[in-house]
Regions:
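HIT superfamily nucleotide-processing domains
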Residues: 1-128
Length: 128
């Protein structure tokens, strides 16, 4: 990976890092949906998490686990959502893959059942 290219082309630069490893870093989301909402960002610029090689993919998800522990210790959430918007039609607005870690707190939604299933409101019921 060319560090200079990464530093000039990524919208995630110049952010305080929560944690990092050889393959990715974690930052707080600039537009958080909850206290502690964070992003895991691959150091190699790829549009999709499906473009990561196995070593990157595995180590990035190890970082997800490490950051979850940091967020739990700092913010004491009751649960977490982990999300990836992969492609424009899935809501991806930045052409650099990243993973959302969203701390959840008891009472932040009246009925949190279904979690990520609620991204398509007309299809939130379980298929019978």
């Amino acid at each position: 990976m060319c560090y200079i290219i990464f530093m000039t082309k990524s919208p995630f630069v110049n952010k305080d890092k929560i944690q990092e490893n050889q393959f990715a870093f974690a930052i707080y989301d600039a537009f958080p949906v909850s206290k502690g909402h964070s992003l895991i960002v691959p150091k190699r610029i790829v549009s999709s998490v499906f473009d990561l090689d196995d070593e990157e993919y595995n180590n990035i998800f190890l970082l997800v686990r490490d950051v979850k522990k940091i967020l739990f210790d700092k913010f004491k959430p009751d649960a977490f959502n982990i999300g990836i918007n992969n492609g424009t039609d899935a809501g991806q607005t930045i052409d650099h893959a990243h993973i959302h870690i969203i701390p959840r707190y008891k009472g932040d939604l009246k009925d949190p059942r279904g979690g990520v299933r609620n991204i398509l409101p007309d299809n939130t019921g379980y298929i019978k």
